[in-house]
Regions:
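Positively charged n-region of N-terminal signal peptides that target proteins for export
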Residues: 1-4
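A residue-level marker of the well-folded mature domains of exported/periplasmic proteins
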Residues: 20-378
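Hydrophobic core
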Residues: 9, 13-17
Length: 378
């Protein structure tokens, strides 16, 4: 009888899969479970090869593995009202776990969470300041957020880049939002420390695209950055990497990726080993772990928290939520080895190296590294 009931339940739930979704939605993964996962995108789309895409892929893979309903939604515009509209559409279609990547969701969470107490809201890169101070949400009884210590990932990428012999650097951030600022400031601090240790002169041209995608204007600005001497540019902002890499490819230049190991993307698209390294945060792993906690019925162990993920171990690189690729994704050499990297990670973990995480100022500062601050390109 139990087996028959289970079969009927699967058929009943599968039948509902024919319901249509939002204006832009991936094919829903529709099986059976009490947990139904929706993801709403922020500024970008699930093809940004970075933050949105990684979150989407983590949610989709988890749903497929566990037989859960999954669908993604893309807001019509870049504002809280449109984000709330997609959240409400997802809830109306039966989704009860809403995953939202990006600080811009703070206002939407603050508006929607109190109205839908039976729904679990998961915000990635949504800080206490964003959610509580800025958006004014005081009741987190159905909310869990994660922030990442991007300054550590940025530091490690900047340190590695200079140690590997690059002293003419560039930085192209997406928009001057907290996570992007922390990445960039960390990159500057790491490059500064490495230059000081090596006793070399180093400089960085520092700009923001003021958007999270590449276009002709950003490419022209990157052309100028490489023409002005940059050997490698940190492409820190979703789709802006297209402009950085297009400009780099014209002069056989180099690039640093962000959020995930972008070497497979960069190198394949531009036909040579363009990637020095990537400043990564554990989006995929932390999204998967959160969804597993929910599926295991342990939501009460994390709800109401804003987790701040960084280094969890001085020795186990795989346990850390921030870092650079330890495999082929980094351009290792005798100048900077995996053992050298492990020592820096241990020094940060043990407090020997302290990294400033100030995200209040878009313009970074350094002691040895010379900074040419360009500001917004657009």
């Amino acid at each position: 009888m139990k087996k028959l009931f289970a079969i009927l339940l699967v058929l009943a739930v599968a039948f509902t899969a024919f319901a249509q979704g939002s204006k832009e939605a991936a094919p829903a993964v529709t099986k059976t479970a009490d947990v139904a996962i929706a993801m709403v995108t922020d500024y970008g789309d699930i093809t940004d090869q970075s933050f949105n895409q990684t979150t989407y892929e983590a949610c989709k893979a988890f749903a497929e593995k566990n037989g859960l309903n999954f669908k993604y939604y893309k807001p019509a515009g870049d504002n809280t009202a449109d984000r709330v509209a997609m959240i409400e559409q997802a809830i109306g279609e039966g989704f009860n776990v809403i995953v939202m990547p990006g600080y811009a969701f703070a206002g939407a969470i603050a508006e929607a969470a109190p109205q839908y107490k039976d729904v679990k809201f998961v915000g990635l890169d949504v800080s206490e300041y964003d959610l509580v101070v800025d958006a004014g949400l005081t009741d987190l009884s159905n909310v869990y957020c994660i922030v990442y210590q991007e300054e550590i990932a940025g530091y490690l990428a900047g340190y590695a880049t200079v140690k590997l012999g690059y002293t003419k650097l560039g930085y192209c951030g997406g928009m001057a939002v907290p996570a992007v600022i922390r990445y960039g400031y960390g990159f500057v601090q790491g490059a500064d420390a490495a230059a000081k240790e090596l006793g070399v002169d180093a400089d960085i041209q520092y700009a923001y695209a003021n958007q999270f995608f590449g276009d002709a204007d950003i490419t022209a600005a990157m052309d100028a950055m490489y023409a002005n001497g940059a050997q490698v540019v940190f492409a820190c902002g979703g789709g802006v990497y297209t402009s950085v890499c297009e400009a780099a490819a014209k002069v056989n230049g180099k690039a640093v990726g962000v959020d995930v190991d972008q070497k497979p993307i960069f190198d394949a698209a531009y036909g040579y080993s363009i990637t020095v390294t990537s400043a990564m945060k554990g989006l995929y792993a932390s999204t998967t772990a959160t969804l597993q906690t929910i599926l295991d019925g342990k939501w009460d162990t994390i709800v109401g928290q804003i987790a701040n993920l960084g280094l969890a171990s001085a020795t186990d690189m795989d346990a850390n939520s921030v870092g650079i690729p330890t495999g082929a994704g980094t351009e290792w050499s005798e100048k900077f080895t995996l053992a050298d990297y492990a020592k820096v990670v241990a020094d940060i973990y043990n407090g020997k190296i302290v990294i400033d995480n100030d995200s209040s100022n878009a313009e970074p500062k350094a002691t040895t590294l010379k900074i040419n601050y360009i500001g917004n390109i657009k």
